Amino acid sequence: MNKTHFNHISVLKQEAIDFLKIKPEGIYVDATLGQCGHTIEIANLLQQGFLYSFDQDVEACTNAKKILPPHLPIEIIHSNFSHLKTQLAQRNVFQLDGILFDLGLSSCQIDNPQRGFSYLHNTPLDMRMNVNQTITAQYILNNYSFAQLKNIFKVYGEVKNAALVASEIIKQRPLCTSYDLVAITDRFCNRQKGHSAKKIFQALRIEVNQELESLKQALEQSLDLLKPNAMIVVISFHSLEDRIVKHFFKKNSTFVLPKKMPITIMPQTPLSIITKKAFLPSEEEMQNNSRSISAKLRVAVKNG
């Protein structure tokens, strides 16, 4: 098969591909198509196999269809990865040889001011990965209660002054643009670890797109889909995602016996963890690609 290459720099790309242990005849899922970085690498290694690449962002799917050569064994599926089992079942696919999750924003989302993900441009507060959904960041800021806003900022952003920020947002309503929100974060949020709005925007984005709940659902579904010896590879970009992945792997790789139960042979667990500690980018990669600095890669294998 002729190889195809793109300039987009995917984080931990080679490491993720190596951990997947691609079989030329295997069936794989790239749960986060993005700008095709991992998708193209996986597809280049397939011969009789096939790859299903998911993305809930219609722009990402449209762009991929324009640039991916027709000869590659890929189907692009416009869907949130929380619908893995349903979407694959519609295609009579019930078992996978591996699945990759590259979580977080893609460059095309960050770099397009009109999408509303960035606090560096004065644009409408949108933040939807799926533009067909109705809930936007602007709706949340102008309609959620004080308690709801405080909880979002505290849990999803780990913001220390969550109550103060929530209270000021309610006072300043309506908020329409990113700079309306930045004016508040500049007053109440710590700038020591980057821009004052960073954690607030992260929290809103997670709420708008229900990112953590979708991840939990997708991980559970992947457990049912993976064949014995199939790999699950997850790249996360903040502690909330990583915590979910770490807990999921641990929960499914340990078996706790009830006290005094007379069992001498331990049952087999669904997963075995390959990366005992999260795999981190090299110093060279972090220097060449600043987006990789917060990345953590975790891998597990499905037991037979």
UniProtKB/Swiss-Prot annotation:
Its main location: cytoplasm. One of its GO terms (molecular function) is rRNA (cytosine-N4-)-methyltransferase activity. It catalyses: cytidine(1402) in 16S rRNA + S-adenosyl-L-methionine = N(4)-methylcytidine(1402) in 16S rRNA + S-adenosyl-L-homocysteine + H(+). It comes from Onion yellows phytoplasma (strain OY-M). S-adenosyl-L-methionine binds at residues 36-38, 55, 81, 102, 109. One of its GO terms (biological process) is rRNA base methylation. It is an enzyme of class 2 (transferase). Its EC number is 2.1.1.199. One of its GO terms (cellular component) is cytoplasm. HAMAP family: 16SrRNA_methyltr_H. It comes from the Bacteria. It holds the Pfam family Methyltransf_5. This is Ribosomal RNA small subunit methyltransferase H. Belongs to the methyltransferase superfamily. RsmH family. PANTHER family: 12S RRNA N4-METHYLCYTIDINE METHYLTRANSFERASE, S-ADENOSYL-METHYLTRANSFERASE MRAW. Transmembrane segments: none annotated. Keywords: Cytoplasm, Methyltransferase, rRNA processing, S-adenosyl-L-methionine, Transferase. The gene is rsmH. It is found in: Cytoplasm. InterPro entries: RsmH, SAM-dep_MeTrfase_MraW_recog, SAM-dependent_MTases_sf. The keyword Cytoplasm applies.
